[in-house]
Amino acid sequence: MDKYDKIIDLTKRRGFLWNSFEIYGGIAGFFDYGPLGAILKNNVINTWRKHYIVNEGFYEIDSPTVTPYEVLKASGHVENFTDPLVECKGCLESFRADHIIEENVDVDTEGKTLQELQEMIEKNNIKCPKCGGEFKDVSTFNLMFATSIGPGGKRAAFMRPETAQGIFIQFKRISQFFRNKLPFGAVQIGKAYRNEISPRQGVIRLREFTQAEGEFFIDSRKKENFEKFESVKDTVLPLLSGKNQENESLSAEEKIVRMSLSDAVKNGIIAHEAIAYYIAVTKKFLMEIGIDESKLRFRQHLPNEMAHYAADCWDAELYTDRYGWIECVGIADRTNYDLLAHMKNSGEDLSVFVELDEEHEIEAYEIELNYKLVGRTFKGDAKVLEESLKELDDKKMEELVEALETEGKYTLKTCKRDFELLKEYLTAKKVKKIVKGEKIIPHVIEPSYGIDRITYCVMEHAFKEEEDRTVMGFSNAVSPIKVGVFPLVNKEGMPEIAMDLKNKLRENGLIAEYDDSGAIGRRYMRMDEVGTPFCITIDGETLVDNSVTIRERDSRAQFRIPINEVVSYIKDKL
């Protein structure tokens, strides 16, 4: 067995990970978290919350996983959320074209077109791995799970492919919550869905997975000189830039350069200080949850693999024994793509007013409504029309005035309804105004975390085989069970003392496990295997002087402390 198989065997035995729907044969791309796996995953998530909500000042929202078609049409997912597909002419089995090529030929398929993938399959005579048959031509496959809302299937929808869109849709409400003062950030943690063509990488490639995403909204002019960057500028990271990836004269080792974030920004490797800052936050989080620093690198997306919404993107990649480097975090500059797309398609104003350093004079349109005519025509919606006109930017106002002048009518789209405006409904004239600010569409820096992949890497990086034991060397932040409590023997009142201590630990918010079965060495080994950092033994000396033996997982060191100091000692260490 390789390391992956050993870890999966351990996680199944000890209640970390199980195949979903196992008694019905299972389905690829789905896993259940068992009792310890669920705690481990939640500890990863709660550590992430600490970094983004407590430390960074983001606030969390929770939106539906079912998303209407029009939302994902506007975001570009209907057109762009695809993978290349090949189907066998014989057995009709489907495969991801790029993966099937990489499994047969030592070549990088990232960013290749459908035609280029087709040529690779033909040139290398790649056949179906299941039956040996030939493939049909490479095509695209949309990865979203389609569904419908309500009876009759009249309202098309999808299971969300990312949590981010829920934040963008509620941008106006979120901005109001922050009193419309940039910059600010919102996060969402929850399930996302990707109908993978042929997931064959265990827990690495899932069809239902957990994302933790942050959306940091900022004035685009503030990205270059980002105030918080000063605190992380000297952080040194292993960077694999797009330029080095394309430099064929460099070896794989030479392509990765360790440098400070300040140098990376200064030399134009990282686009700006804002995205560099969240790369540093990502590294800090990964270190706290126990990722091996020697198995972490940050890789820049090449232009031909950049997401449709991104101006720059860096992946935190973690090394795994079986699958090599895998993408676990993406830190992207999404510009104002999403807000502009949803403004265009919803008719809602998603701009933010920002104050200028100095006042200045401008020319702007002033609208005067024919309230009698507008009230008679639009009745209760007249107020909606008035407010919508006030929110129009200069470009939209010019468009409206020109249409009324040349065509005598204009359709104003708002989130509530469309207004068919006639020339006689209003007058517009240009006036000079003193302005103290302007409306802008904020840009977005997005750190997006794949929690399931990260949780697996936490397990793999913690997994150690020693001569006489197997250890999950989890960091204290994420270990599922914090303390094992044992009576040395099941008599003389030791079980009662041990049980009482376990209860006190739990009352103080620490997950403690009582175990009185088998030799004490076997009990230590069981706790080592699930990553418990401390074990406490109640023995004969406890009955004499109220002291207990504490044993540390990693060093195996043992020492005694008074039983009434155990809770404070463990809490201090954790």
UniProtKB/Swiss-Prot annotation:
What highest taxon heads this organism's lineage?
Archaea
Q: Which GO terms describe its biological process?
A: glycyl-tRNA aminoacylation
What EC number(s) has UniProt assigned to this enzyme? 6.1.1.14
Q: Where in the cell is it found?
A: Cytoplasm
Q: Quickly give the catalysed reaction.
A: tRNA(Gly) + glycine + ATP = glycyl-tRNA(Gly) + AMP + diphosphate
The keyword Protein biosynthesis is assigned to this record: yes
Primary location: cytoplasm
Q: What class of enzyme is it?
A: ligase
Q: Mind telling me which GO cellular component terms the entry cites?
A: cytoplasm
Family membership, please give it.
Belongs to the class-II aminoacyl-tRNA synthetase family.
Protein name (record): Glycine--tRNA ligase
UniProt organism field: Methanococcus maripaludis (strain C6 / ATCC BAA-1332)
The gene it comes from is glyS
